[in-house]
Amino acid sequence: MREILGNRTPEQNKKMFIQIMRSQIPKEYMSDEEFNKHFNPKYFPWEQRLCLSPDNDFFESIKNGNSKVVTDTIERFDENGICLQSGERLDADIIITATGLNLQTNFPMATMQVTVDQKAYVANEHFIYKGCMLTDVPNLGFVQGYFQSSWTLKADITAEYFTRILNFMDDEKLDMFVVKDHGKIQEMPRPDPSEDRSPNYTKRTREYSVKYSEQIPFAVMSNFEEDREMFQNSDLINDGWLEFASSRQNNNNNNNTVSSRL
């Protein structure tokens, strides 16, 4: 759904959404100038999350005069409300903050102190692999679903993938897997902050986040069909990146790694 309503034709879809909103708030309720100021965001659909009003109660409340939408930048708070950069003031008895979120900066370790070969883990030194592993971090897998569609769609195929890896390791008497990029992956450029239309809470932590690329399997995809193809129908193990080993081999000074097609 996200691919249909946002990514492929962002300009056209933004125009469509604005037209739909305008049809719900006719000119007798709001002038063109006011509507364009408050209902024409600087970002495209899905660059920031959409809000839905299934019963149309949001627009009915505006037409009834019970609600008002103001799009601006907060300059500061005072004892009576909110001061905006435009110079406008909004009086408020109660302010419910919906911004100011802070994402974890050491994904996916959060507050855990992790070291690999006596070196501290730093997120922005590692590529994400298939959306569920990190380069040079052995025996680590994590499950993260989709944000714009059902979380479990991605979670399920990721869990199935890990199950196949563990079964393979049991069969081959292996006890370690690790992803190696061999210095061959080009990082996706991080957006210029002045041009980035992402939510502020993602901008604040972008430089501390893991690296990703346009090259599969180091790309981050949000399409179930593409992910399912990558996980289930491609050469999952013998792809040149995921390596396996046995501690018994290493203890015997046998530096063999094993890869196989699943």
Enumerate the predicted regions with their spans.
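N-terminal FAD-binding dinucleotide-binding subdomain shared by FAD-dependent oxidases/monooxygenases
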Residues: M1-L262
